[in-house]
Amino acid sequence: MPGVLWVKMDSVASGYWNMEEATNEVFKDGWYCTNDMFTFDAYGHFEYHGRIDDILKISGQWVSPIEIEEEVLKNKLISEAAIVGVPNQDGLIRLALFIVVPELTESKETFEKELIGSLKTNLSIYKCPRKIYFLEEMPLTATGKLQRFVLRDLVKSL
């Protein structure tokens, strides 16, 4: 079961400038909550499971996008993958998968069908995306972090 990483050291800030509410959420008694989810492996090494903000509840189950993305990236034609949760008309969260496939060798429809078939074989059904979107590149910040909110907004605009 993943847990949230908290850190405490001399170089950790004591809070955010002029943001008392945000400070109170993540700074407690000299500790800082990273909002990063980890487990320990058998050797005591950290295994990263994503940001707590990115964890999704699908069909009553908690789902880490990273687990699905790692499975998607086993397909060697896919260079990048990102999972986001988007609400449907009933307000239920559904998974949308964004992929970058630099050298697609077949139709998008055929590739999508084969990929979903592979995911259904290797993942629980509730972890399988309902829709796949092909992108030329992922939206990234200046520091190279994925902007999942841009992907969610993209789905809403379609």
Where are these regions (language model features)?
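Conserved ATP/PPi-binding loop(s) of AMP-dependent carboxylate-activating enzymes
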Residues: 1-26, 61-63
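AMP-binding/adenylate-forming catalytic core of the ANL superfamily
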Residues: 9, 14-15, 37-127, 144, ...
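Short proline/glycine- and acidic-rich turn/helix-capping motifs at secondary-structure junctions
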Residues: 132-142
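Short, low-order "capping/linker" segments at domain edges
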Residues: 142-148
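A short, polar/charged loop-to-alpha-helix boundary motif
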Residues: 155-158
